[in-house]
Amino acid sequence: MYFRASIFRIWIFTSSLVFSFSCFALIEVTDDLNNKIVLSKPAKRIISLAPNITEILFHIGAGSSIVGADEYSNYPSAAQSIMRVNNHSIANYELIISLQPDLVVAWYSGNGVDIIERLRHLGLPVFVLEISTMDQIPVLYQKLGQLTGSTKKSKEAARLFSERLDELRSNYLGKTKVKSFYQIWDDPIMTLNGKHLVSDVIELCGGENVFLNASPLVPQVNIESIIAANPEVILSSGSEARVKSWRQKWSRWPSINAVRQGHMYLIPPDLMQRQSNRILDGADYVCQFIERYRQDQSSQI
């Protein structure tokens, strides 16, 4: 009888430990807006509200858990079959709720406060990202890896990203600064200030964003201010088919150093506009184009 009673007490004790552990083994992650997201288990039904988020989730091994995505999520190809729940300014809240997500991942400057707050008001856990530097990306991988249970692959992705980033840094460290202008729209002319990830890429390559201190994040600038800044390299995103017409527009202002010397370059759009793992490929282009200017100057000495 004593033996049985002892076994019973041990069973009760160990069961209570297991129960306590299950109660307290919560997943807690802080997002880029300093909000804490708490999940009782890894998310398996995820809503991605932006294409960069979709790319990252696939990259860290959580793509199969995405049940809803924005209409621009087209990479990788597996993303094209996912249910569409939003565009950049409108979300289908009824559809999102019907998909019973256990996690929503949003992009602050891309989706906006209204959509994010509405989803939170509906009781959904929303992780918000807002990347302004390259160093934030491997950290983001690991945070999303925790939330999705894809910790092993996310750590490996973070390691590989950091290694490649460090290699780029070492290649261009100490190089002569090159005044650079990044155009995202032509009518009106718009650019990106120093708080945007693209500006960090330019700096990584030894460039200097001529509108570093402008405001807001995406400022509208006039041609007079560009002439005054006199960039040595002008960058934008677009296809090869657009290069000729784009350069032709700039040819009206030959007083700008970049125009006069022909240092105007287009980068494949998704590589720079999406804050995902492919930003490193975009950075390769930026660094090569800025380096062309340096080499051109060296050859003229």
Predicted segments with their positions:
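Bacterial Sec-exported substrate-binding components of ABC uptake systems
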Residues: 2-3, 8-15, 22-54, 151-181, ...
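Structured C-terminal subdomain patch of bacterial secreted/periplasmic proteins
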Residues: 91, 136-139, 143-146, 155, ...
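His/Asp/Glu-enriched short active-site or ligand-binding loop at hydrolase and phosphoryl-transfer sites
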Residues: 70, 195-218, 238, 265-266
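Short helix-initiation/N-cap motifs at beta->coil->alpha
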Residues: 32-34, 85-94, 214-223
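Short secondary-structure boundary segments
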Residues: 50, 108-109, 184, 214, ...
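Short helices/loops that flank or line small-molecule/ion binding pockets
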Residues: 93-100, 122, 221-230
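A short, structured surface patch at a secondary-structure boundary
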Residues: 44-99, 103-108, 210, 238
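Flexible loop/hinge segments that line or gate small-molecule binding clefts
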Residues: 75-78, 111-143
